[in-house]
Amino acid sequence: MIEKIWFHRHPLGYLLWPLLWPFSVLFGVISRSRRKAYQTGDKPSYRAPLPVVVVGNITAGGNGKTPVVVWLVETLQNLGYRPGVVSRGYGAKAPSYPLVVNEQTPAQHCGDEPKLIFQRTKAPVAVDPVRSQAVKALLEHGVNVIVTDDGLQHYALQRDIEIAVVDGVRRFGNQELIPLGPLREPVSRLDEVDFIITNGGVAKANEIAMRLQPTDAVNLKTGERCAVSKLTRLCAMAGIGHPSRFFNTLRELNADLVHCQGFADHQAFDAAQLNQLAQQGDHLIMTEKDAVKCAEFAQPNWWYLPVSAQFAPEAEQRIVDKIKEVMEPYGSPSA
């Protein structure tokens, strides 16, 4: 319901306006005061001894940050740099912090997004609610540039480049601050970032257009790859910020969909729940982010759909040029 109020002007939103508006004003005052305290030095912030690139957004919910992080890490690796990734590990609880992710780390300990990033890139990934501690853990792993997954509003960590990801379809909803609207910060905050990446929809003049390019479906048990259109009677599920985006992608791939089930972002799943869901079709298909949480109890007819961020070559070059410019003062040449 909150999504409908934020993005679709549901009538209930007008009824709740008098109740929620004061809290949005308070949220804005606290947010601005907190940021100013970091900017003036009244609150301490950590300056890492190597470049920090933040990938985040100004709205609550999923905007496509993780594919951008994966693309950025792979791009840095291809340039010869040694990137490490910092994440808060939303929705997870590790035995201790900081946690450096490895092949055996369960998603329940590190979070679905850090696990996905590690599996896709093999770059060092450190999880800690205090991101400066995660950075310090990565320094022991020979990295020479830090990429933070989310954290645009985590001003306790100083940064060299800011990349904001925007949902090109939903944009900023009613353009109100939480809880009346989806905004973590005012839209004007985007005037200060280095790059605005627009996921889907139509990018504006100062934005970089991104599309998510799907590949073949991958079997969770065997790793077999298969065109989505060849899988019969698919039951689709998605525990992401905008499930309908995933379902629309499947339709564009001519998927034989018999049922679509959306879940909350970062939803925890169990075998019984998904076995029951899978009975509604011949195959169960999910996002790659969901797959990292379901691999331990996956069945032979469960699949996931990987997607990769794609940009126009000139847009990629703009980002690469900025990274190289920022790396120089740190004396962090590529390996």
Swiss-Prot record:
Pathway: Glycolipid biosynthesis; lipid IV(A) biosynthesis; lipid IV(A) from (3R)-3-hydroxytetradecanoyl-[acyl-carrier-protein] and UDP-N-acetyl-alpha-D-glucosamine: step 6/6. The keyword ATP-binding applies. It is an enzyme of class 2 (transferase). It comes from the Bacteria. The keyword Lipid biosynthesis applies. It catalyses: a lipid A disaccharide + ATP = a lipid IVA + ADP + H(+). Its EC number is 2.7.1.130. Belongs to the LpxK family. This is Tetraacyldisaccharide 4'-kinase. It comes from Vibrio cholerae serotype O1 (strain ATCC 39541 / Classical Ogawa 395 / O395). The lineage of its organism: Bacteria, Pseudomonadati, Pseudomonadota, Gammaproteobacteria, Vibrionales. The gene is lpxK.
